[in-house]
């Protein structure tokens, strides 16, 4: 399985639109090579190099298998609580 985004290049910077300096919306994601027997997906977007330790930006589970997750998606599976102690996406916001 491979996850990519058309919003930025691999190993590139995340555009400000998807950070606290911009609209702070989730980027579009494409999922490739999803095994046919997949029942559900889990999404974890974290920053292991954050100054205060690993920072969870986006957590969701029980996501219906799909090949595209649209930009600014709402209601994606069952949301988990991120490091801001809220559900949904919270983009990078370096100090």
Language-model region placement:
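N-terminus-centered regions that define maturation/targeting leaders and the start
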Residues: 1-95
